[in-house]
Amino acid sequence: MSENQEWLKPYAVFCALAEIFQTTEHWLWGHLAKCDDKLIEKLTDPETSPIYSEGVHFVYYLQWRLHMQLKEASTYLKQFGIALKGDLPIGVDKRSVDVWRKPELFRFYTKYGRTSRCVR
């Protein structure tokens, strides 16, 4: 876990809160709408977190199972000269853990592609 805690802890908290609030629209989460290191540490502490046992810990488990399954599949496919490839998104959804965690890193008013002044 220690090598993945930078992304796994915020992700687990985000998933747990999204389940509690029944939405990923984090700006609707009241005082939990703003994420910081203290909040993440508080909500991932197994001794004191009100969401740890049913939410955060479950996400840790799911991510571990996914890791093990992908590792096994990758090892199996490697025997046949097949490699698994991932995909990197160009854009980020404003309802994502990345935006909740570090909103200052994203601009949502950028336009891509042809502008309205371009006419064929």
Where are each of the predicted segments found?
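Active-site-proximal, well-structured secondary-structure segments within enzyme catalytic domains
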Residues: 1-81, 88-120
